[in-house]
């Protein structure tokens, strides 16, 4: 049996972090190993928790979005990165900045779990369900 994917949740809102943790705690192949509410804490948390994947709110306080992704890619290039946003227009910018995937926060939990699975298999999933 494979080890579960170790996930860090990065969102400035406690309610969103709680919802994501609740969802991921139900998945047998995923383990939430950390949470952050500000960009300045993210790289250290990824490294101390040995994270495989980050769920990153596009509006995470503390650093401009593209600069944060660039810093993550420089410090933790092997870590998968899924950007979450309630604004579908952020998709292109997130993917161009280096995210492995983008998920609109209005998508279903099943969809988010499928994107996590794709990302963990190192298949870049760059299509937003709503855009064909």
Walk through the language-model features, giving the residues of each:
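Conserved phosphotransfer cores of two-component systems
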Residues: 47-49, 71-78, 97
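Conserved phosphotransfer microenvironments
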Residues: 55-72
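Hydrophobic/aromatic residues positioned on beta-strands within the core alpha/beta folds
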Residues: 82-84
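Alpha4 helix (beta4-alpha4-beta5 surface) of REC/receiver domains from two-component response regulators
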Residues: 67, 87-103, 114
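C-terminal output helix
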Residues: 107-120
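Acidic, metal-coordinating helix/loop segments flanking the phosphotransfer/catalytic sites
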Residues: 35-53
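The C-terminal output helix
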Residues: 117-132
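Conserved acidic segment of CheY-like receiver
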Residues: 3-16, 20-24, 54
């Amino acid at each position: 049996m494979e080890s579960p994917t170790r996930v860090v949740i990065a969102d400035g809102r406690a309610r969103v972090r709680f919802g994501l943790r609740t969802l991921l705690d139900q998945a047998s192949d995923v383990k939430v190993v950390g949470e952050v509410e500000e960009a300045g804490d993210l790289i250290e948390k990824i490294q101390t928790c040995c994270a495989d994947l980050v769920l990153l709110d596009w509006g995470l306080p503390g650093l401009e979005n593209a600069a944060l992704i660039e810093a993550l890619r420089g410090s933790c290039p092997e870590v998968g990165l899924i950007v979450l946003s309630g604004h579908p227009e952020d998709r292109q910018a997130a993917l161009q900045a280096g995210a492995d995937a983008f998920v609109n926060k209005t998508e279903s939990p099943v969809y988010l779990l499928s994107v996590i699975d794709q990302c963990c298999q190192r298949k870049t999933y760059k299509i937003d369900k709503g855009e064909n």
